[in-house]
């Protein structure tokens, strides 16, 4: 794969990025850019992911999209459906699922016997939260742009659990919302036939506690 083009909402910023990274093409028109490439990597704000992905897919271009591919289940399904109809690829960029570390964890699961419980967490105090508390609401804390704790950070816990354990038989969850409706923290419990998996995620508290998977013969601790 060879990066050849960049799109930005302003030509000046596109030109600056292209020069900095040695890209031959720079665009401020998304449609024009998609006509010059074979595939598109979408790393814009979450609220724009679906529209841009659909635009590229409808133009016959493969899409690798930053998480989440859409601000809702319907949007995500719409992108994958558009790709399937055209025989092209739409894929969410979940890099950590394809790392050697993730494979080590997969390989270690049988060593701890029948798994009964797992606690998976990512609690990371956002550097933008202090500004929110002081009255300045930056884009990362604006729910109208498709942003939330689950979309920004909780998705890593969720995809990690689904990769290791598959889909649960049932699930439930609760969230903590800030004054503007932004989801600041959340917790999900996933129930399986013989085990329970708890997920915790936040952009407004910090924790260094590890993720732990407990089996009948031992446990796996992940820092």
In which residue ranges do the predicted regions lie?
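Aromatic/hydrophobic pocket-lining residues that form π-stacking "cages" and hydrophobic walls in ligand
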Residues: 14, 52, 79, 105, ...
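Contiguous beta-strand/loop segments that form the cofactor/metal-binding neighborhood of enzyme cores
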Residues: 157-223
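Rossmann-fold dehydrogenase core element
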Residues: 3, 77-95, 114-117
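N-terminal Rossmann-like dinucleotide-binding module
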Residues: 1-21
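Short active-site oxyanion
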Residues: 2-5, 38-40, 90, 147
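Beta-loop-alpha module in the N-terminal Rossmann-like domain of NAD(P)-dependent dehydrogenases
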Residues: 21-82
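Hydrophobic residues in well-ordered beta-strands that form the structural core
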Residues: 27, 65, 90-92, 222
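Predominantly a Rossmann-like dinucleotide-binding segment in NAD(P)-dependent oxidoreductases
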Residues: 96-169
């Amino acid at each position: 794969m060879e990066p050849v083009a960049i799109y930005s909402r302003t030509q000046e910023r596109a030109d600056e990025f292209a020069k900095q990274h040695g890209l031959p093409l720079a665009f401020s028109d998304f449609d024009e850019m998609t006509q010059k490439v074979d595939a598109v990597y979408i790393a814009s704000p979450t609220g724009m992911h679906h529209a841009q992905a659909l635009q590229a897919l409808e133009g016959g271009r493969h899409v690798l999209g930053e998480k989440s591919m859409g601000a809702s289940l319907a949007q995500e399904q719409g992108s994958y459906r558009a790709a399937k109809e055209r025989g092209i690829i739409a894929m969410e960029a979940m890099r950590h699922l394809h790392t050697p570390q993730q494979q080590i964890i997969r390989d270690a699961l049988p060593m701890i016997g029948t798994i009964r419980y797992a606690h998976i967490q990512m609690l990371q105090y956002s550097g933008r939260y202090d500004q929110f508390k002081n009255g300045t609401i930056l884009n990362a804390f604006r729910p109208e742009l498709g942003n939330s704790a689950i979309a920004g950070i909780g998705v890593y816990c969720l995809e990690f659990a689904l990769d290791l354990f598959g889909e649960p038989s049932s699930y439930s969850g609760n969230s903590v919302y800030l004054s503007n409706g932004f989801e600041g923290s959340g917790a999900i419990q996933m129930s399986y036939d013989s085990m329970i998996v708890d997920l915790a995620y936040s952009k407004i508290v910090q924790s260094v506690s590890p993720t732990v998977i407990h089996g009948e013969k031992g446990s796996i601790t992940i820092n």
